[in-house]
Amino acid sequence: MLKSPLFWKMTTLFGAVLLLLIPIMLIRQVIVERADYRSDVEDAIRQSTSGPQKLVGPLIAIPVTELYTVQEEDKTVERKRSFIHFWLPESLMVDGNQNVEERKIGIYTGQVWHSDLTLKADFDVSRLSELDAPNITFGKPFIVISVGDARGIGVVKAPEVNGTALTIEPGTGLEQGGQGVHIPLPEGDWRKQNLQLNMALNLSGTGDLSVVPAGRNSEMTLTSNWPHPSFLGDFLPAKREVSESGFQAQWQSSWFANNLGERFASGNDTGWENFPAFSVAVTTPADQYQLTDRATKYAILLIALTFMAFFVFETLTAQRLHPMQYLLVGLSLVMFYLLLLALSEHTGFTGAWIIASLIGALMNGIYLQAVLKGWRNSMLFTLALLLLDGVMWGLLNSADSALLLGTSVLVVALAGMMFVTRNIDWYAFSLPKMKASKEVTMDDELRIWK
């Protein structure tokens, strides 16, 4: 067996495939590094503009002072504690128009969005009488609107409460801080009638836009020019339309679904960042780095199919290929992925794939013309390589059926090999015959292959 040319041929080809794994892994490392560079650019854009935004509010914040007594030893001692009681709206409606623009640093781009939001909230303050007690004193209330990054707050029109324009102040006005704005309510008995708040807010950010459905019943409608939204958070849109020109989505929720009425318990530590929210993220569809990385996962399949085609060609013809020729063709297939990565950063992934495929086919076509001693066989292999590139492109663009397509390719390739080699006597398989006057021994065949 160890002297069999077929054994050594299969062993050498297997070793060549394993050897080609080294440059493939190096290329995958380059892909990771380039993706990290792109992430650094996105972080730089985020640091120079504003980050993800999570809007909470509007809420009425009521400072409360409560007197209570405790028993200490033989006497009763009066104590006092202060906290903020948050009064949530009966209904909250948010209507937004989002415009996404791309910022570029070098060859990398990131997305920054600008949203014009209209907030409408109705507060039933008459029910605050439930909190009245002799030992409770209310302070001056104010309306709170919290955001994730105050740097993204742009133009804020004067809010109106029951038709009266009020002033708006920076900061949440809460002791625990937080980023946002607050609106002091006017002097007087503000509890005499329900409050209706209307305000417009320009908010910018990167990544996610989230709105906490604080109302007993909450609705949000958002229209955007970005065609690649990612709907995140705790609630999917009740309605959504996505097209090449952008998207429109509508969310609905109530306290029955989100339990926010109880979660906004009295106290200063509200943990708003963990509250459920309507969310949408401005994302990039599978970018060139993700697609190139996925493509490299099929590299071994491409190399194996090419080597298998060469092996069948050797088996059916008198032409013999040296292991170095296998290796050079394999390296050209590996270089396809590095060329694809480099081109995709400038031309886009589709254009890069076409150019890299044509360059690889041309390079192999010219080389195989000399190796296979003619243009006919060279053109057949070149067309086969282009066909394989097309199959790989189909695998990358059909994520849901990639397993089915990949399996089909392997089955067809194996069936084709079985068909064309069905009449071969593998025991009698040998290298091309030498001159008739000289007997061909097994050692001769093994020496020629090696």
Indicate residue ranges for each PLM-predicted region.
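Alpha-helical transmembrane signal-anchor/signal-peptide segments
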Residues: 27-51
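Short extracytoplasmic
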Residues: 46-71
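Soluble non-transmembrane domains of integral membrane proteins
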Residues: 36, 40, 47, 61, ...
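Cytosolic-side membrane-insertion boundary helix
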Residues: 274-303, 322-323
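Membrane-entry segments of alpha-helical transmembrane domains in multi-pass membrane proteins
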Residues: 7-11, 104-111, 183-189, 291-301
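Glycine- and acidic
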Residues: 24-28, 285-295, 394, 398
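Hydrophobic alpha-helical transmembrane signal-anchor segments
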Residues: 2-29
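Generic detector of multi-pass transmembrane helix bundles and their immediately adjacent loops
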Residues: 300-450
